[in-house]
Amino acid sequence: MKRKIVIAVDGTAGSGKTATFNTVAKKIGYEFIDTGLMYRAFTLLCIESEIDFNNKEEIIESLKKFDFSVKNNKPHLNGKEVEKRIQENDIVKFINYVTPIPEVRKFMVEAQRAMVKGGGYIEIGRDITTVVLPNADLKIFLDSSVEARAERRFKQNERLGIKNNNLNEIKNSIINRDEQDFKNGLRKAEDAWLIDNSNIPIQDVVNMVIDKIKELEGN
């Protein structure tokens, strides 16, 4: 009987982590966890509980009522599916009140570790390969050149009909985001598999990763 493994994924913004590894998870029957959604779900809990976001103690106390899970690759808050709700503007408005709190960060890291016990999970997010899951069975750092990421974003904006779509502005935005992320600790773990998908179609990356997972599972 094959064993299910734990896969940790980090990488640069806009490199396609979600699209790539959500696809991998669906193809091999694993659960996909975007840890950033945990913070969004917790922000939603605080909103629904009418927490004063200027009161850190109230926010920390709310962690006792927070139960996050993933079922069929969809985020659930206290048993309720919240995939669309946590993308709404009020979440974006208030999330920065909760993410800097050390007690919230500590709670989330412990939860992120506990969720993947037993294997069968792909987890992506901040510090996943270096801090959260340093002993994951497979660690991957997904990267892509600034030019490739900007071109993809530009084409995506075109498809969505977004106005003021400027390639150079997108490039500068990506460069600034990279600088900020690396300043805040983004780095490739020494034993992580570096995949540069600048010139590789997403489906080819998906197939490469699935082959590696099957190898580690003992297939």
Curated annotation (Swiss-Prot):
Domain of life: Bacteria
UniProt main location, coarse: cytoplasm
Similarity section: Belongs to the cytidylate kinase family. Type 1 subfamily.
Protein name per the record: Cytidylate kinase
Catalytic activity: CMP + ATP = CDP + ADP; dCMP + ATP = dCDP + ADP
Residues that coordinate or bind ATP: G11, T12, A13, G14, S15, G16, K17, T18, A19
GO CC terms in record: cytoplasm
Listed EC numbers: 2.7.4.25
InterPro entries the record matches: Cytidylate_kin (IPR003136), Cytidylate_kinase_dom (IPR011994), P-loop_NTPase (IPR027417)
Gene name tied to this protein: cmk
Coiled-coil zones: none
Class of the enzyme per the UniProt entry, highest EC level: transferase
